[in-house]
């Protein structure tokens, strides 16, 4: 049994459970986005996590999950999805028009945070969280979220 723990959550799984788990993948975001804790990521609990919490993976290598249900006991951070967009020039311009500042994370994406921040003219910080990632259909997506208090 492999145990993952941080200040707020504990998650335990077996290597067999991880090997045999069959997660669902999606290119459509639900109401919530989940980012596993560092402990879960380091332990490699990617598929078993999706199966145990009935969340869908956005891509096999992105390690971001989505669901229409809020899972307060998910071992990591939860966000409410506000809006999404692709990476077309016009689409990005409209998406960024009303936001000057956000916390930006990239997962399985072909640009760095610094490069993307420069391209989007986005300052660090604030209460908005943006994720740039690759979806199950191999398309690139920008996701604007708000952090959810799971207490």
Give a label for each model feature.
Residues 1-151:
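SAM-dependent transferase fold signal centered on methyltransferase-like domains
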């Amino acid at each position: 049994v492999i145990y993952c723990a941080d200040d707020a959550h504990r998650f335990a799984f077996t290597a067999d459970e991880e090997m045999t788990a069959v997660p669902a993948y999606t290119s459509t975001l639900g109401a919530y986005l989940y980012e596993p804790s560092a402990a879960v990521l380091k332990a490699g609990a990617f598929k078993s996590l999706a199966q145990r919490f009935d969340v869908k993976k956005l891509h096999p290598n992105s390690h971001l999950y989505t669901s229409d249900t809020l899972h307060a006991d998910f071992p990591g951070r939860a966000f409410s999805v506000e809006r999404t967009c692709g990476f077309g020039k016009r689409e990005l311009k409209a998406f960024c028009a009303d936001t000057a500042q956000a916390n930006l994370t990239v997962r399985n994406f072909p640009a760095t945070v610094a490069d993307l921040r420069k391209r989007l003219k986005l300052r660090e910080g604030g209460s908005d969280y943006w994720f740039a990632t690759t979806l199950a259909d191999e398309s690139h997506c920008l996701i604007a979220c708000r952090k959810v208090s799971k207490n």
